Amino acid sequence: MRNSFLFTSESVSEGHPDKVADQISDSIVDLFLAKDPEARVACETLTTTQLVVLAGEIRCKGVFEDGEWAPGALDEIEATVRRTVREIGYEQAGFHWNRFRFENNLHGQSPQIAQGVDEGAGKDEGAGDQGIMFGYASDETPDFMPATLDYSHKILERMASDRKAGIAPFLEPDAKSQVTLRYANERPVEATAIVVSTQHAPGYYFHNGEGDEAKYTELRKYVLGVIADVLPAELLTANTVYHINPTGRFEIGGPDGDAGLTGRKIIVDTYGGASPHGGGAFSGKDPTKVDRSAAYITRYLAKNIVAAGLARRCTIQLSYAIGVAEPLSIYVDLHGTGTVDEGRIEAVLPQLVRLTPKGIRTHLGLNKPIYRQTAAYGHFGRQADGDAFPWERTDLVDKLKAALAV
């Protein structure tokens, strides 16, 4: 790796239209898993001005069976969608949780897909689709995440918390952040540029002589304070450039400003561009879908490898075929930072964790309603707490060391 370089990652807030769609989709996943831990869900969401549309396939005992909805199920789905939007904070003329039109186009899962995936006599549960999945970890932050993405997430998470608490009442739900860091010897040494664009209450802008300079100064001062709280002080220098709402006025936002779709922020969801991505989104999918569960187990394995001191950086790839239980390939890359041969680690991992779809779900406890909270501010680098974010645990460290005799 080069000795000195710049690297950038971005994040988007829970009020970004694509993230609104992700959170709605995962709220539906949680709704069905709470009723049937073996539910099959593939829920896509479209959001736009005063409209939310669901589409996809499901199978859920007691909710949708034999092509029929259970009494009250459709009302519960709509209530879940509206509650999710309300919790995000949308009560605007162009997008209001209690006034948008709602369309539910969910229907039954294809029996031809089900026959390849379901367990049967003498047959293990197969992968729900073919594909490649990547996991990554780095020791550059306590969360074992790329610092550029870690800080981008935390800036927006703090702003959302302050908005909901009334500390920053001039903020509205839609926002984006971007952090550029200079690295030396693979360590972040300086923030060269930070971008924050946030939707705001009327009047809180000043651009090309238009707007209210005092209100914009208040907003800018607040955002700079959040940045100073999130980033380590030694990274912020006299040369750091700040772009706070650089286009000026940002009053129309969220689904009223741009249409949102599930699965369009997969780099924000994962590693901010620091790692390869297999291309499959997570939100709206139950954990039998390896796009989701295999991405979680690869993060878990990579994080435990780095936490065990076996490497400073680790990338893992798994691949699957639809209807086939075992992965087709396992690949480990320690980026020249490892203390153990990568081939040895590749051989050991399947001995420690069964990497079939069912094995992954069992090891991590994924058949639970834990997904809405993953759908904003990143699926990785979060705090494992009870059932939440189990792929962030580091409980495999000792077993890895023992298996590799280190």
Curated annotation (Swiss-Prot):
Q: Which reaction does it catalyse?
A: L-methionine + ATP + H2O = S-adenosyl-L-methionine + phosphate + diphosphate
> Could you say which residues bind ATP here?
16, 174-176, 249-250, 258, 264-265, 281, 285
Q: Which UniProt keywords apply?
A: ATP-binding, Cytoplasm, Magnesium, Metal-binding, Nucleotide-binding, One-carbon metabolism, Potassium, Transferase
Give the cofactor note: Binds 2 divalent ions per subunit.
Task: Give one GO term, molecular function aspect.
Answer: methionine adenosyltransferase activity
The Gene Ontology biological process annotation of the record reads:
one-carbon metabolic process; S-adenosylmethionine biosynthetic process
Q: In which pathway does it act?
A: Amino-acid biosynthesis; S-adenosyl-L-methionine biosynthesis; S-adenosyl-L-methionine from L-methionine: step 1/1
Residue positions annotated to bind K(+) are 44
Enzyme Commission no: 2.5.1.6
Q: Which cofactor does it need?
A: Mg(2+); K(+)
- What is its EC class? transferase
**Classification via InterPro entries:** ADOMET_SYNTHASE_CS (IPR022631), S-AdoMet_synt_C (IPR022630), S-AdoMet_synt_central (IPR022629), S-AdoMet_synt_N (IPR022628), S-AdoMet_synthetase (IPR002133), S-AdoMet_synthetase_sfam (IPR022636)
Q: Where is this region: Flexible loop?
A: 109-119
Kindly list the positions annotated as binding L-methionine.
Answer: 57, 109, 258, 289
| Domain of life according to the entry | Bacteria
* Subunit structure of this chain's protein: Homotetramer; dimer of dimers.
Q: Which family is it part of? A: Belongs to the AdoMet synthase family.
Entries under NCBIfam families matching the protein: metK
Briefly state the protein's biological role: Catalyzes the formation of S-adenosylmethionine (AdoMet) from methionine and ATP. The overall synthetic reaction is composed of two sequential steps, AdoMet formation and the subsequent tripolyphosphate hydrolysis which occurs prior to release of AdoMet from the enzyme.
**PANTHER family in the cross-refs:** S-ADENOSYLMETHIONINE SYNTHETASE (PTHR11964)
Q: What is this protein called?
A: S-adenosylmethionine synthase
Q: Which organism is it from?
A: Sphingopyxis alaskensis (strain DSM 13593 / LMG 18877 / RB2256)
